Each structure stands twice: as structure tokens, then as C-alpha cells.
Amino acid sequence: MIQGSIVALATPMEPDGRLDVPGLRRLVEFHIEQGTDAIVAVGTTGESATLDEEEHTEVIRLVVEQAAGRIPVIAGTGANATTEAIRLTARAKAVGADACLLVTPYYNKPTQEGLYRHYLAVAEAVDIPQILYNVPGRTGCDMLPATVGRLAQVPGIVGIKEATGKLERLAEIRALCPEGFALYSGDDATACEFCLSGGNGVISVTANVAPRLMQEMCRAAIAGDRATAEAINRRLEALHHDLFIESNPIPVKWALHEMGLIQEGIRLPLTWLAASCREAVRQAMRQAGVL
């Protein structure tokens, strides 16, 4: 089981929107050096929605190649068509991903039975560890604990990224799932308490810019060291908030550019961080000691 701080990696782009391959390789090395426990490539923060299928697979391939077995790579392969999710998952497996993260189908708002059949179909079609991803604030679809419990019985479905921010869900899901089923927070603001309450880690936006602190916070929280975990988290609280001052990944890409790690590149309909928001993010970075 992967535990700890799992970065939801931003996808570096050149100012004209093309993929920045050297920048991507540089970010992977940065996370390995900083102690990040695993990388999610082309999730929400990786702008999966604006990458075409070839680019999607290429980013995963490049991250796997650069990681070279030193850190697990989880590929974002969710889609709102089951056939597409199967195809993306198969392609991720073919280029060496260790696991896949599949967001619930978005926009078309499936029923709970539809969600069950969707994930079952992917698990039956592609033999790779599969992590469910529930983020109703983006998808318009909330996967309920009972559905997670059903899916946890399916071979190959190994965990969930639960991004509602509802801490009570941790106990509800844990009670319905077999031992060893991984529960990851998808909400940086509540991740510390999530891990202190028995969660296995966080798939994090904040970890893009403060990877060492996020890893240390997760390690302490999973070990039950509340004092240490909360002390570290206090340094991160402003980042947890201000990296969402505009839609993710707008602020985090600006922050990474401010750190000199990536170029000033993002794809429409996302735009570069508004000037009026920059000082708040800059101050949050200073509070965390990353600027």
C-alpha cells in the first residue's frame, strides 16, 4: 500500500501551451529529492481535461521514465465514458504506471449503480491497481460510502481518494471496506486530521510547492504524533487555502513559476493567476518557508 504524501503533479507547459518536457522531468526529480511518497500524473492538477489522449499518455510515460522505479507513479485515467476510461487505463498500464486514479464520471451524473458498473468494468478490463476518486464539487456526482464498500470487494480496486472534506466519511468508508483498502484525503485543508484519524495519506495540491513539509506532516499524522503533525500543518494552512484562491491548478502553477521550477504556461480555458491574488499566495509560500 502506498502511504503518505502523494503529489497531484502539475503539468509544466511552455508559454504557448506546449508540454514542457524538461520542466516535467525537473519536477519529478524535485519530488524525489524532497521525499514525496508517490506521484499522480495527469490528475485534476495535471490539467488532464486540456490534454489530448496522446499527450495524456506521453506525460505518464515521461513521469514513469524519469522516476525510474524510485517512486510509485499513479496515472489519472478517469473519464465520463467508461470505454474511454478503459482505454486510458490500458494505455497507462502499457507505459508502466504502478496504479491508476479514476475520477467519478463527470457531467453526466450517473446513479450509484452506474458508478458501480463503471468501475467494475474498468477493473475487469485492465489488470492494474485502481484508486477511486470522489470529488463531487467538480464532477456533480457524489459516490456514497455504500457504493465504495461494494467496489472495495472488487479485485484490483485498492483504495479511494475522498475529496469531499467530510471527515466523518473516513469512519463510514472504513467500516464498509476490507482491511488493507487505502483511504486517501483529497482535501489539503483537512488532510492532517484525516491522517490522524486513520487515513493512509493525502493526494495533495499543496505538496507541489511544499513537498518536504507535506511528507513530514503525513508521516507524523499516520504515526499518531498529533503535536508534530499539527505544528507542521499550521505552517501549511495558508497554502492549503490560497492555492485555491482561483481554480486549481491556476495558483499552484503560478507558485511553481515563482519558485523557478516551471515556465509561465497554462491552457485555456484556464488563465494565469490574477495579479490581485498573487500577494496572498506569495505570503502563504513565505509562511511555509518555500519562498
UniProtKB/Swiss-Prot annotation:
Main location: cytoplasm
Enzyme Commission numbers on file: 4.3.3.7
Residues the record marks as active site: 133 (proton donor/acceptor), 161 (schiff-base intermediate with substrate)
BP terms from Gene Ontology: diaminopimelate biosynthetic process; lysine biosynthetic process via diaminopimelate
GO CC, any one term: cytosol
Residues that bind pyruvate: 45, 203
Domain of life: Bacteria
Record-marked site positions (Part of a proton relay during catalysis): 44, 107
Catalytic activity: L-aspartate 4-semialdehyde + pyruvate = (2S,4S)-4-hydroxy-2,3,4,5-tetrahydrodipicolinate + H2O + H(+)
GO molecular function per UniProt: 4-hydroxy-tetrahydrodipicolinate synthase activity
Subcellular location: Cytoplasm
InterPro entries: Aldolase_TIM (IPR013785), DapA (IPR005263), DapA-like (IPR002220), Schiff_base-form_aldolases_AS (IPR020625), Schiff_base-form_aldolases_CS (IPR020624)
Pathway noted in the entry: Amino-acid biosynthesis; L-lysine biosynthesis via DAP pathway; (S)-tetrahydrodipicolinate from L-aspartate: step 3/4
Enzyme class, spelled out: lyase
Assigned protein family: Belongs to the DapA family.
Function of the molecule: Catalyzes the condensation of (S)-aspartate-beta-semialdehyde [(S)-ASA] and pyruvate to 4-hydroxy-tetrahydrodipicolinate (HTPA).
Protein name: 4-hydroxy-tetrahydrodipicolinate synthase
Source organism of the structure: Methylococcus capsulatus (strain ATCC 33009 / NCIMB 11132 / Bath)
Taxonomic lineage: Bacteria, Pseudomonadati, Pseudomonadota, Gammaproteobacteria, Methylococcales
Gene, per the UniProt record: dapA
